[in-house]
Amino acid sequence: MAAYAAFKHVELYNVGKAKKRVLRPPGGGSSDIFGSEMPQTPRNVKNRMASNIFAAEKDNGVKNNVRQGAHRFYFIGDAPRRGQKTVDSHSRLFGEPTRPITPGKNHMKSSIPFGQNTEAVAAQKLLTTNGHYNGKSGSVSSASSSVSSSTENLKMNSGSRSEGNPVTGEGYKVVANEYSQRQESSNGGTPVINKNRIPPGGYSSGLW
């Protein structure tokens, strides 16, 4: 009971009473700490009846008058905000950074050489690519000669294939016998016996 009596005078008499608050900060209601009077600026009141169709308002900066979603409409005399240039403090203090001038690339110009020296240009390119000739000793093959040689090889292969029937294998020359005869003549002495190898699926598969 003594604990209740000791606590009673601290808390119970303050129940329901509001705390005292400071209504004004020290020094008055203004935030001026130096005591000088602030200049009173007149309040701007917008004239809502004034028309701004033909000219931008003098007091206000550039603004968007009507906005509807992504579409923005500008009246005569107004300019979009994107046109305003932002002032960078670095460029204002140190000037514009100097950028190296790069020449413009002509994208319409063809990279294929035309004219009479196409063979010489192709030969020069092949000569300088790897620093050595293109597989043939003492000669540089150009693109046109490689194309013509590849077409000749195709003609020769197609001619040899047309002699026989690829399905049955009839009419083809037996290449293994020619190969064994060549080796006999080259060695001169003992003939080398080569076994004829049959491809998987036989000769009638069309792959061989």
UniProtKB/Swiss-Prot annotation:
The modification Phosphoserine is found at S30, S111, S139, S150. Residues 137-150 have a biased composition (Low complexity). Residues 24-43, 82-106, 132-208 are annotated as: Disordered. Keywords: Cytoplasm, Cytoskeleton, Microtubule, Nucleus, Phosphoprotein. Pfam families: JUPITER. The modification Phosphothreonine is found at T41, T98, T102. GO terms for biological process: positive regulation of microtubule polymerization. Coiled coil: none annotated. Belongs to the MAP Jupiter family. This is Microtubule-associated protein Jupiter. It comes from Drosophila melanogaster (Fruit fly). The lineage of its organism: Eukaryota, Metazoa, Ecdysozoa, Arthropoda, Hexapoda.
